[in-house]
Regions:
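N-terminal secretory signal peptides that target proteins for export/translocation
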Residues: 1-2
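Sequence-structural signature of mature extracellular/luminal beta-sheet repeat domains
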Residues: 18-324
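Bacterial N-terminal signal peptides
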Residues: 5-16
């Protein structure tokens, strides 16, 4: 997830919606408003591929945000995502295809992920913490420091089947920080938070700038994108949550990462690039927006790929299912 303070200067600034927990956003066609749309994404086309539904196109679902990030799917297939500079989390309902606000003043949430109990976890960048939201919008702070020092800025996260949380902690200096903007830890690392939220440990300290992160559904492998080094790594996850057997998966970094039921990995940046479990490129989904930040599968059948890109939310129908 790239430094939004640089990217958002290219995007139009919009006013945040009024604060309440969950409410419907009004569809407004005036300049700068958040709009729900249903048009194809420009002239972008997708090369025929067995992963992608026949004739499918990238569709723009909504626009007018400042910078979209962190899509995550709930048990019903609804997709939650962040409008990070506007400090809010939104919901795209798959039932009625409408947009609503889940939470405002969400700690500048970035990466999101649901735990097995249906709580929404967020990398809340305002104070460099990880938050847990219940579905009423109440939150608790799960972590804010390591060994007595503030985190640099938790960026993205994945929940292991055992309930533990793997997360990345790069440094992207934010203009809204009141803290010292210098590096808080002695590097930009990957961490693990135990299922009871009591133990935190570094699991990879030999990485330049970890960003996107995802694990295999069986909990045996972890994938971490090093966006600075333009590499993505795969690790074996041990019973004690440590990582071993680190290998280069592909020579491409990524802002966000997701995985499908066949084990294919979806990396972002300039559109969405898909790699098979061997690390071989097998598809590319172009997106008209200048920067594609993150992706997740959603929908009732988990066969829709949702894409957060710049000031927009997109989707495309797939032949493969995502995983939770």
């Amino acid at each position: 997830m790239v430094k939004t303070s640089i990217l958002i200067i290219f995007f139009s600034i919009i006013m945040s919606a009024p604060a309440n927990n969950i409410k419907q956003l009004n569809v407004d066609t005036t300049s700068g408003a958040t709009n729900v749309v249903s048009t194809s994404a420009g002239k972008e086309t997708v090369t025929d591929n067995e992963l992608i539904a026949k004739g499918a196109k990238v569709e723009k679902l909504a626009d007018g945000f400042r910078f979209t990030e962190g899509p995550a799917v709930d048990k019903k297939g609804n997709v939650y995502f962040t409008d990070q500079p506007n400090n809010r989390i939104l919901i795209w309902s798959v039932k009625d295809e409408k947009l609503s606000v889940f939470h405002e003043n969400c700690g500048r949430a970035n990466g999101l992920y649901f735990d097995k109990k249906g709580n929404l976890l967020s990398c809340s960048d305002m104070d460099n913490e990880i938050w847990k939201f219940d579905m009423d919008g109440n939150h608790v702070v799960l972590i804010s420091d390591f060994e007595g020092k503030k985190m640099n800025g938790p960026n993205d996260l994945w929940v292991h089947p055992n309930g533990g949380i793997y997360f990345t902690d790069p440094l992207y200096k934010r203009d809204y920080w009141t803290r010292d903007p210098k590096m808080q830890q002695d590097g930009e690392y990957v961490y693990y938070l135990s299922p009871d939220y009591k133990k935190v440990m570094r699991v990879d300290s030999e990485i330049e700038k970890p960003n996107g992160i995802i694990g295999s559904p069986d909990g045996k492998h972890l994938y971490v994108a090093d966006i600075k080094a333009s590499k993505t790594y795969v690790y074996d996850i041990q019973p004690d949550a440590t990582l071993t057997n680190k290998k280069l998966f592909t020579n491409m970094g990524s802002d966000g990462v997701t995985i499908d039921s066949q084990g294919n990995l979806y990396l972002t940046g300039r559109g969405v690039t898909v790699f098979n479990p061997k690390g071989e490129k097998i598809a590319h989904i172009p997106v008209e927006a200048g920067w594609t930040a993150n992706v997740c599968f959603g929908g009732k059948d988990m066969k829709t790929l949702f894409i957060t890109a710049s000031e927009n939310l997109y989707s495309i129908r797939m032949n493969v299912k995502g995983t939770r």
